């Protein structure tokens, strides 16, 4: 499944370097393609850069940090993208405050689950890719063009994915060209080969806890009426995922670590304040807690 992709500049064969060595011309509109041909050593190894060390072999992938779980929900007039904060390394917790959701331009954000190093490079390089195109062309990519650009990057990681270095993005955005502003929120999921799917159900999740998160969103999605209710449902979905998936981290009230979330609407992409996420997380935990969670003695009752 693919959109038409007219958002490309003409290639330039007059650039120095590989153009004179018989290689194809450089596509100026793609920063990743330009870098791959002019200075491939600056790219992540999985996307065409220099391979080095044991990380390029399948033998060491089990000890690399991995990140999970990302959820996205559409609401009238926009979309929410949220992620937990835990990364794991084998059966160990590698990090408790990892950022997995990134704003990539004014109207899109990506959340990536999988091998942490590749996932972070995906998000950063994709943001540069969008900015690079806008600077050269003078206008931003259409949402269809953004999807195709990310699909190309994911496909470029296929060789590494076959060795276990998988990183799968979840793209959320607001299509400013949509005829109906209330239904302009978009969620796009990808597979390891670069195939993509535009979600029509209104919610999606990736990562090891995705099956539990999607089940939770399926039950709670009818409660979504605006951005705030969508953020609450996203937090509940991550809480449910953390309850059953050891690689997903739930709200940590002791350390003050909470999921991160981004809302994207007609006003653009905005990070949800941590104070609001903390408030919603406490409400979710309180609503799930038994009356005697801390025992009868905590309330002064008789044994």
From Swiss-Prot:
<feature type="propeptide" description="Removed in mature form; by autocatalysis">
    <location>
        <begin position="1"/>
        <end position="67"/>
    </location>
</feature>
<comment type="similarity">
    <text>Belongs to the peptidase T1B family.</text>
</comment>
<dbReference type="GO" id="GO:0005737">
    <property type="term" value="C:cytoplasm"/>
</dbReference>
<dbReference type="GO" id="GO:0010498">
    <property type="term" value="P:proteasomal protein catabolic process"/>
</dbReference>
<dbReference type="GO" id="GO:0019774">
    <property type="term" value="C:proteasome core complex, beta-subunit complex"/>
</dbReference>
<keyword id="KW-0888">Threonine protease</keyword>
<keyword id="KW-0647">Proteasome</keyword>
<dbReference type="InterPro" id="IPR022483">
    <property type="entry name" value="PSB_actinobac"/>
</dbReference>
<keyword id="KW-0865">Zymogen</keyword>
<protein>
    <recommendedName>
        <fullName>Proteasome subunit beta</fullName>
        <ecNumber>3.4.25.1</ecNumber>
    </recommendedName>
</protein>
<dbReference type="InterPro" id="IPR023333">
    <property type="entry name" value="Proteasome_suB-type"/>
</dbReference>
<dbReference type="InterPro" id="IPR001353">
    <property type="entry name" value="Proteasome_sua/b"/>
</dbReference>
<dbReference type="GO" id="GO:0004298">
    <property type="term" value="F:threonine-type endopeptidase activity"/>
</dbReference>
<keyword id="KW-0378">Hydrolase</keyword>
<keyword id="KW-0963">Cytoplasm</keyword>
<keyword id="KW-0645">Protease</keyword>
<dbReference type="Pfam" id="PF00227">
    <property type="entry name" value="Proteasome"/>
</dbReference>
<comment type="pathway">
    <text>Protein degradation; proteasomal Pup-dependent pathway.</text>
</comment>
<dbReference type="GO" id="GO:0019941">
    <property type="term" value="P:modification-dependent protein catabolic process"/>
</dbReference>
<comment type="subunit">
    <text>The 20S proteasome core is composed of 14 alpha and 14 beta subunits that assemble into four stacked heptameric rings, resulting in a barrel-shaped structure. The two inner rings, each composed of seven catalytic beta subunits, are sandwiched by two outer rings, each composed of seven alpha subunits. The catalytic chamber with the active sites is on the inside of the barrel. Has a gated structure, the ends of the cylinder being occluded by the N-termini of the alpha-subunits. Is capped by the proteasome-associated ATPase, ARC.</text>
</comment>
<feature type="active site" description="Nucleophile">
    <location>
        <position position="68"/>
    </location>
</feature>
<dbReference type="InterPro" id="IPR029055">
    <property type="entry name" value="Ntn_hydrolases_N"/>
</dbReference>
<keyword id="KW-0068">Autocatalytic cleavage</keyword>
<comment type="function">
    <text>Component of the proteasome core, a large protease complex with broad specificity involved in protein degradation.</text>
</comment>
């Amino acid at each position: 499944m693919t959109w038409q992709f007219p958002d490309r500049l003409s290639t330039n064969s007059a650039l120095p370097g590989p153009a004179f060595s018989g290689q194809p011309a450089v596509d100026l509109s793609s920063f990743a393609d330009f870098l791959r041909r002019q200075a491939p050593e600056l790219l992540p190894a999985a996307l065409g850069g220099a391979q080095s060390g044991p990380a390029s072999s399948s033998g060491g992938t089990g000890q690399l940090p991995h990140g999970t779980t990302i959820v996205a929900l559409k609401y009238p007039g926009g979309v929410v993208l949220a992620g937990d904060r835990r990364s794991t390394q084998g059966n160990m917790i590698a990090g408790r405050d990892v950022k997995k959701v990134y704003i990539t331009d004014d109207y899109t954000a990506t959340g990536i689950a999988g091998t942490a190093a590749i996932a972070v490079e995906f998000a950063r390089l994709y943001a540069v890719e969008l900015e690079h195109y806008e600077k050269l062309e003078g206008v931003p990519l259409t949402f269809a063009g953004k999807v195709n650009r990310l699909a190309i990057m994911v496909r470029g990681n296929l060789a590494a994915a076959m060795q276990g270095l998988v990183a799968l993005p979840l793209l959320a955005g607001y299509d400013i060209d949509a005829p109906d502003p209330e239904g302009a929120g978009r969620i796009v999921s990808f597979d390891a080969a670069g195939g993509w799917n535009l979600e029509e159900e209104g919610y999606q999740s990736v990562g090891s806890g995705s099956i539990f998160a999607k089940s939770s969103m399926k039950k709670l999605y009818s409660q979504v009426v605006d951005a705030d209710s969508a953020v609450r449902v996203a937090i509940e979905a991550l809480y449910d995922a953390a309850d059953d998936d050891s690689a997903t981290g739930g709200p940590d009230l002791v350390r003050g670590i909470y999921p991160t979330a981004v809302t994207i609407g007609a006003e653009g992409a905005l990070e949800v304040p941590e104070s609001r996420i903390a408030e919603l997380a406490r409400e979710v935990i309180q609503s799930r807690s038994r009356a005697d969670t801390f025992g009868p003695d905590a309330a002064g009752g008789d044994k």
